[in-house]
């Protein structure tokens, strides 16, 4: 306040705030102000402000602010059918100079999306991404963020139509990848360095570990309004692309190590030159494919937002539309090129691997400069690495099956069944995650989601997630029939389309997706209850399980067909 001589004075205030911090000691230095600004200055000192009309701002009854104003420290989540806006205040100002520095994991939930996932739990990727970190330094200006948004209402028919086109695109992409794999399996590198087959599911699984996770995370960010600001949008995009390149390089290297170990265990044979070739091929493929797919993914997300399409329905399948084809083509080309140089130019392979590994620090520096990805450099590796290991086990099954000349027909169908299963379960996981972000806070489940999870609960009901599970399951059989007929028309593969083969294949595909959607219903809610972001944690596990289940069920199906006499040795060879 100012004294009679116009000099500024210091006002000290002790206030008891009903929050976790107890007593708060504020020391506020006020310069000379005009009388007409005095009321606004007092209002700016209130630690909780609800942005409403100016005339309602002055209402006060019995010491309690009305029409949405709560006492200091009570940051209630307000649900409304209309858009609700919050005034986001600075925690540093709130804590003042009482000696308590604001924690990076302090509880401030101005809306559901800004919940801090590191609140006594493991930090997750969306923890840093979806929080409101951009607090203005001007304490006299209100920063308005959008609050609770309603999930877009969709009928089953609209949902199916939105999913159908990207689903078919993704399916044809996996069909093309399967035909490419059917061709390249006869190349020298695939014949002499069979561990490359172990790399195939692990590297194709990167779309589930990274691309689909990015797609689901950005889709959630779009639906809850976190990409409305251009600055915030590009911070999310640039930071996450740099982070994704770091993760892709590390996972590619670890996938090669896993392939070397899993390839060595059955026969006990080890080749150092082959190990270097695997590492270089894997790292280079992961880096290049991840960069290309990441750019495509960002374009899809931004385009979906501008056209009004729900990105949850289209982003994840489009992320996989050309992902398998791009990754497999790059892997085959690089590995074959390095293999031809193995004898004459032996130094080319280690130089290629060293070059892409040397780019990792640059990606770390870029990612560390963005608040959205800084914390993820120290966390979020668990699901990515675990999913890579699960996919590598599926690759070992594929390598073992392909080594049997009677079962080589499995090659063309493996990317198809794995890709389709992963696409469908990623859509469901992304939709459930968006629903939870809009209707609950991490650590707390909605009432309808509590209890034991069983298949009937996943597929029977009138909830939006029940309907999406039904739609996705109904797409399995007609979708795979289209893809099987496409493979038949292209005269690819080593298996003819007999009725018994179609029945066995469709049963394996249906069982895979049925199991994955059931697991997804439990897993997404499980991670949400644990306070972990399901966009970052569930999708890598689910797509990896899709690879493992698809490859295993397909291998069992081909063994069954061979036992009952449905045998085709060289169809389309």
Curated annotation (Swiss-Prot):
A molecular function GO annotation: monoatomic cation transmembrane transporter activity
Extracellular side stretches: 1-162, 217-245, 304-313, 369-376, 428-469, 521-543
What keyword terms does UniProt attach to this protein?
Cell membrane, Ion transport, Magnesium, Membrane, Repeat, Transmembrane, Transmembrane helix, Transport
A GO BP annotation: iron ion transport
Q: Which SUPFAM superfamilies match?
A: MgtE membrane domain-like
**Residue ranges, Cytoplasmic side:** 184-195, 267-282, 335-347, 398-406, 491-499, 565-573
Q: What is the documented function of this protein?
A: Acts as a plasma-membrane magnesium transporter. Can also mediate the transport of other divalent metal cations in an order of Ba(2+) > Ni(2+) > Co(2+) > Fe(2+) > Mn(2+).
Homology family: Belongs to the SLC41A transporter family.
Protein's UniProt name: Solute carrier family 41 member 2
* Annotated organism of origin: Gallus gallus (Chicken)
């Amino acid at each position: 306040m100012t004294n009679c001589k116009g000099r500024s004075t210091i006002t000290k205030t002790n206030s008891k705030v009903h929050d976790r911090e107890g007593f708060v000691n504020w020391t506020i230095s006020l310069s000379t102000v005009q009388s007409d600004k005095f009321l606004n200055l007092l209002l700016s000192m209130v630690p909780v402000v609800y942005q409403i009309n100016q005339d309602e701002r002055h209402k006060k009854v019995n010491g309690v602010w009305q029409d949405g104003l709560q006492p200091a420290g009570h940051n209630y989540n307000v649900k409304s059918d209309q858009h609700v806006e919050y005034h986001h205040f600075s925690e540093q100002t709130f804590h003042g100079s009482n000696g308590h520095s604001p924690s990076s994991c302090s509880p401030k939930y101005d809306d559901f999306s800004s919940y801090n996932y590191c609140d006594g739990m493991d930090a997750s990727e969306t923890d840093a991404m979806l929080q409101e970190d951009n607090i203005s330094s001007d304490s006299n200006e209100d920063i308005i963020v959008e609050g609770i948004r309603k999930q877009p209402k969709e009928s089953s028919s609209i949902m199916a139509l939105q999913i159908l086109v990207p689903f078919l695109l993704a399916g044809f992409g996996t069909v093309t990848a399967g035909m490419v794999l059917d061709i390249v399996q006869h190349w020298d590198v695939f014949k002499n360095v069979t561990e490359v087959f172990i790399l195939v599911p692990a590297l194709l699984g990167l779309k589930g570990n990274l691309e689909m996770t990015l797609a689901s995370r950005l889709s959630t960010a779009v639906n809850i309004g976190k990409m409305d600001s251009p600055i915030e949008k590009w911070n999310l995009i640039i930071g996450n692309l740099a982070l994704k390149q770091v993760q892709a390089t590390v996972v590619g290297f670890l996938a090669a190590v896993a392939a070397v170990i899993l390839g060595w265990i059955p026969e006990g044979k080890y080749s150092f030159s082959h190990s270097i070739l695997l590492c270089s091929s894997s790292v280079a493929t992961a880096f290049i494919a991840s960069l290309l797919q990441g750019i495509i993914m960002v374009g899809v997300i931004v385009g979906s937002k501008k056209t009004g399409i729900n990105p949850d329905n289209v982003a994840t399948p489009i992320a996989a539309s050309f992902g398998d084809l791009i990754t497999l083509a790059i892997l085959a080309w690089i590995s074959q090129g390095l293999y031809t140089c193995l004898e004459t130019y032996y130094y080319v392979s280690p130089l290629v691997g060293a070059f892409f590994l040397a780019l990792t620090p640059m990606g770390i520096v870029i990612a560390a400069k963005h608040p959205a990805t800084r914390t993820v450099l120290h966390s979020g590796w668990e699901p990515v690495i675990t999913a890579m290991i699960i996919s590598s086990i599926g690759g070992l099954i594929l390598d073992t099956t392909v080594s049997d000349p009677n079962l080589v027909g499995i090659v063309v169908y493996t990317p198809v069944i794995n890709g389709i299963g992963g696409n469908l379960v990623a859509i469901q996981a992304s939709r459930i995650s968006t629903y939870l972000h809009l209707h609950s806070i991490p650590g707390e489940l909605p009432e309808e989601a509590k209890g034991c999870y069983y298949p009937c609960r996943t597929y029977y009901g009138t909830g939006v997630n029940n309907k999406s599970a039904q739609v996705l399951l109904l797409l399995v059989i007609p979708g795979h029939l289209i893809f099987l007929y496409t493979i038949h028309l292209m005269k690819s593969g080593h298996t003819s389309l007999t009725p018994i083969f179609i029945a066995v294949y469709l049963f394996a595909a249906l069982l895979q997706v049925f199991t994955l959607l059931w697991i997804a219903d439990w897993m997404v809610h499980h991670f949400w209850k644990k306070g972990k972001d399901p966009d970052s944690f569930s999708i890598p596990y689910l797509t990896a399980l899709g690879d493992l289940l698809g490859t295993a069920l397909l291998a069992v199906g081909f063994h069954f067909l061979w036992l009952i006499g449905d045998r085709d040795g060289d169809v389309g060879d």
